[in-house]
């Protein structure tokens, strides 16, 4: 977004601008004159405009200049500002989080408690390198002697196979994309092969659930009696040989397709859907989910190999405190009660740049940072995030609905690629759904149906009059939503989705409906489809 970028440049008081290439510079050059820039650096070898009023150097010119000058180290302390990272929030103008050298060094030091990579291990990087999650991950991995390789969405799957990384840092949407790619390959196999794969996945699903209960690592069975854990251990023991056979016949091939050497996927920047947690555990690729925010540098909690409680965001990393309080009174709540998540520790930012009022609102006099997230603490001190306070949907009967867990459950359906719940002040929930057209085509063939779908850019009238809105497809989505919602742990009748609309344009960063870390910008999506949402509840 050019306007957002212009705002950040002005607000940050930057005097130097570093851009990827000449094409990018040409896009933003018109508003550079509004900013007191002294230097522009191109990270390419392209020749800049010599007549530009702002001094511009390409990468080679910068290196030549550096070779002529000796390095003069600058005396900095842990308390000094290291960077401004602007929140790519889902609402409002971005704010510059002031992170110190001490904030970032805490992450390098504390993340050793989460993963212990070996010198020479390879990590594949795909997230924006300016993002706090990626940035702290890079600092940590490089401090451990790892080799870091940057890839892109276009080259990601090829690089994964060729470079064979041991570690990856990513967001849930990335792991979902890998999962969908694997599912697509499995759906293309013969019916017999599909039945064999389904058999082993069902066996392994039972195996991992039993193992979790036996090891007291199940979010749904904290109060399991000794007898229940004994039965679970016995069941896991009996299923282990079949799970191992499935690993040899099926899961090893899947891992080989992902490079074959992955030891750890570190996931952050959003909740990980339960079916993804289950899938990667089944194929023996550990996913360590972490939690944090730009304002906390970012990691505050993380699961580890020795304490990997699926569905949770892990225990606090060293020197970090988590408090759950009542959102209205700010009084601490007992363990197990859901409330507002507050954070205190050496990773918490100094404040928002040039925004003292916003800083005072975010950080109280005792140093507690208001995350804006809702969650609760398990008996083993794991943090479980249930949603954003601002995202809560309040139905007209007064029931509060956290949309994220329900959305995560629904995208387990192979026919749902993306979705966003709506329903503020309505009788029931509704949903905007981006369907998986490939999976729908396969389903149609199995049903002896010839389905034709309009292009993504088709007018709404054409979409509504297409096969997407014919009874068989509509009934399929109704059944999928009903099943996935009801199968979700903690299901309540108010969780049911009574209305939905299908949209063909995916939520993306490019169309402004997702943040850079691939979180849906709910207000933007709501505004864009307000008419459709109104019609959903008026019909």
Locations of regions flagged by a protein language model:
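Structural core segment of the AMP-binding/adenylate-forming
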Residues: 1-61
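Conserved pre-ATP/AMP-binding loop-to-beta segment of ANL
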Residues: 57, 64-86, 93, 116-122
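Conserved AMP-binding A3 loop
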Residues: 82-108
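Active-site loops of AMP-binding adenylate-forming
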Residues: 101, 281-285, 293-311, 326-328, ...
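Conserved AMP-binding/adenylation subdomain of ANL enzymes
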Residues: 105-125, 129-251
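Conserved ATP-binding/catalytic segment of the ANL
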Residues: 329-336, 340-395
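Adenylate-forming
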Residues: 348-349, 382-411, 440-471, 492-494, ...
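Conserved C-terminal "lid"/linker of ANL adenylate-forming enzymes
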Residues: 418-422, 443, 448, 478-539
């Amino acid at each position: 977004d050019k306007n957002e970028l212009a705002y950040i440049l002005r607000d940050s008081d930057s005097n130097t601008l570093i851009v990827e290439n000449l094409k990018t510079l040409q896009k933003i050059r018109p508003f550079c004159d509004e900013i007191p820039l002294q230097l522009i650096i191109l990270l390419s070898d392209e020749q800049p405009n010599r007549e530009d009023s702002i001094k511009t150097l390409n990468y080679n010119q910068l290196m030549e200049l550096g070779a002529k000058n000796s390095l003069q180290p600058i005396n900095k302390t842990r308390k000094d500002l290291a960077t401004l990272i602007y929140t790519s929030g889902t609402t409002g103008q971005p704010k510059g989080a002031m992170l110190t050298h001490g904030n970032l060094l805490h992450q390098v030091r504390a993340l050793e408690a989460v993963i212990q990579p070996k010198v020479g291990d390879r990590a594949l990087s795909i997230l924006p390198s300016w993002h706090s999650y990626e940035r702290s991950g890079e600092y940590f991995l490089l401090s451990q002697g790892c080799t870091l390789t940057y890839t892109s969405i276009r080259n990601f799957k090829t690089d994964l196979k060729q470079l064979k990384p041991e570690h990856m840092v990513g967001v849930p949407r990335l792991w979902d994309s890998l999962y969908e790619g694997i599912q697509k390959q499995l759906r293309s196999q013969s019916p017999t092969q599909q039945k064999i794969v389904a058999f082993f996945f069902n066996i392994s699903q039972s195996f991992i659930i039993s193992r979790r209960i036996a090891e007291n690592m199940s979010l749904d069975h904290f109060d399991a009696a000794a007898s229940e854990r004994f039965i679970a251990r016995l069941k896991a023991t009996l299923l282990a040989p079949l799970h191992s056979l499935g690993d040899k016949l099926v899961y090893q091939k899947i891992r080989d397709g992902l490079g074959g050497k992955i030891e750890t996927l570190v996931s952050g920047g959003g909740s990980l859907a339960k079916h993804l947690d289950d899938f990667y555990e089944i194929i023996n690729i550990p996913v360590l989910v972490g939690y944090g925010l730009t304002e906390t540098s970012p990691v505050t909690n993380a699961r580890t190999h020795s304490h990997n409680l699926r569905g949770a965001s892990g225990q606090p990393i060293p020197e970090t405190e988590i408090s759950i309080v009542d959102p209205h009174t700010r009084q601490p709540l007992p363990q197990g009660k859901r409330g507002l998540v507050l954070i205190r520790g050496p990773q918490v930012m100094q404040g928002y740049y040039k925004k003292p009022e916003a800083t005072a609102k975010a950080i109280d006099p005792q140093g507690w940072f208001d995350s804006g997230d809702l969650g609760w603490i398990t008996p083993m001190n794991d943090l479980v995030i249930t949603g954003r306070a601002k995202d809560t949907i309040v139905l007209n009967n007064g029931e509060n609905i956290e949309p994220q867990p329900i959305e995560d459950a629904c995208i387990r359906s192979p026919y749902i690629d993306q979705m966003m719940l709506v329903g503020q002040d309505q009788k029931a929930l509704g949903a905007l759904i981006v369907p998986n057209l490939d999976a729908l085509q396969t389903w149609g063939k199995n049903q002896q149906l010839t389905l034709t779908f309009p292009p993504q850019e088709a007018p709404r009238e054409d979409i509504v009059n297409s096969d997407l809105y014919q009874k068989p497809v509509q009934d399929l989505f109704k059944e999928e939503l009903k099943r996935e919602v009801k199968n979700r742990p903690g299901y309540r009748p108010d969780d049911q989705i009574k209305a939905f609309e299908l949209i063909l344009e995916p939520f993306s960063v490019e169309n402004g409906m997702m943040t850079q870390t691939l979180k849906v910008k709910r207000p933007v999506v709501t505004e864009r489809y307000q008419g459709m949402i109104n019609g959903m509840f008026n019909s």
